[in-house]
Each structure stands twice: as structure tokens, then as C-alpha cells.
Amino acid sequence: MRLAVTGVTGRMGKSIIQRIIQTQAHQVDNKFILGAAIARDRSDICGIDAGTFVQSSKVGVFITDNIELVKGDFDVLIDFTAPESTMNYVNFCVMNNKNMVIGTTGLSKSYLSVIERASSKIGIVYSANFSVGITIMLKLLNSVSKISRYFVNIDIVESHHNKKKDIPSGTALLIRNVVEYNQFSDCVCNEDLVSNGEKKYGKLDNDIKIHSIRAGDIVGEHSVLCTSIGERLEIKHQAFNRIIFVDGALRSAVWLGCAKIGLFDLNNVLKINM
């Protein structure tokens, strides 16, 4: 299977290309190969071999900012960019019958609706987090949400590196949605609670709040704290290396292939039953 990777200068885009090239060198059956590497418009790295760019061996795939030029070179597109760019890639893939793996976060309700409509024509695996651990955590939280009435407060704490733009994280929103049984709900910022570089978010009509921290080079940490008088239940996930998200995205691309149509998530890919 030939994969296209967008946002090649970003943390995830670069890591995905590195992983594909590394895996290509050791694959016997060539389960996947790099077919295209796509950068933002007018990027000064266009024309450079993707392998050279990620400090690996040359692969004969040259970075481009024009996806039209490489549409015949890939089967599935992996996108971890920005919301507006993702929408452009979704429209392109629908027009050209290409399946997608989307890990872009910070998507609005209207953008999520675009993805849902597109999935009636192409196959899309969309997730705010491609780690196995988070997928299992969400399964556990399905049970916790059923007993949430026994706790006085439920809080979500998420920490990421100081370059991450979206606050709160897409994973934190997903966690809250699982607990609330509300998919793709909005998050409201209470500016009165902003202090010391920490922003606290929460819907105005319930007691579930999201606390977001941006500091240093934290890959990703998410905790759910269920508290009552005298006790606390905490469920926590820590990501120590970005490679867990990369491997989840690649596994999703292989699972999705060219033939599947519909909207899927990592739970569909992993087939976890709890």
C-alpha cells in the first residue's frame, strides 16, 4: 500500500515519514511504502527527497506542495495538520476516491460534519489520539461514567508541550464526551479561572471541567479525577514517545486500505472488547 503523508515539517508528519522509511527497510511483504510527501504551500523544502529531509536514506519520493501532482502515487492519505488544511485534503480525497487517516485536532462541529459526510463516499479513520492506551482508557471510562453520580466532582487534566496550539486537547474533549455521553460537544472557557499559565475549561451547565497545561516538551498526559469527600479515583495515561501515535496511524492506514467506506476510529481498528 502506498501512503501519502501531509504536513511533513510538523512533529507528526516528520515522525510518520521516518517510521515508514525505517519500516520499509525491514519489511518482507512491503505492507506499506511512502508514496508521497506533501508540505504546505510554497514551502522551501519542496523538491527535497523525503528521506533526506528526515535524515534517513533517500527513497525517491520528493516533497511537493501540490497534491494534484502526486495523486496517482498513493492509496491512503495520512493527515496530521491544521483544521483548514484537513478540510482541503478531505475534499480532495472525496473527489479522487482516496481513503484517509485523520489525526488533526481542534476540529469544529462544522468540520466534523464535513468528515462525517465525506465518509459516505470514502473510508476515514478519525481519532484525536492514536495510542492503544488511550483507546483502552476510553473503554474504562464507559464504565466510570455509569457510576459518576457517586462522585462530587469529575475533572480532566491534560498536559502537552508548549507548541501545541489547540486548548483543550482533542483527547480531553473526547474523554469528556465519553463521560457525558455527548459526542463532539463544545468546551467553554471560564476566563475567571485562568492563572499561572493554566486554563480551566468547563461546560457551564455541569461539573465536569477540563484543566489544560502547556509546558516544556510534554508529549501528552491525560488524567480523569473522580473525587468525593475523603477519596479520589484517578485514571491516567502518559505518552512518553510520539511513536505510539505514529504506529497507531500506520496500523489504521493498513487496516483501512483502499476498499473500506465509512467513518471509523481506533477502536474499530484494534477491535477491543471490554
Swiss-Prot record:
Belongs to the DapB family. GO terms for cellular component: cytosol. This is 4-hydroxy-tetrahydrodipicolinate reductase. It is an enzyme of class 1 (oxidoreductase). Pathway: Amino-acid biosynthesis; L-lysine biosynthesis via DAP pathway; (S)-tetrahydrodipicolinate from L-aspartate: step 4/4. The keyword Amino-acid biosynthesis applies. It catalyses: (S)-2,3,4,5-tetrahydrodipicolinate + NAD(+) + H2O = (2S,4S)-4-hydroxy-2,3,4,5-tetrahydrodipicolinate + NADH + H(+); (S)-2,3,4,5-tetrahydrodipicolinate + NADP(+) + H2O = (2S,4S)-4-hydroxy-2,3,4,5-tetrahydrodipicolinate + NADPH + H(+).
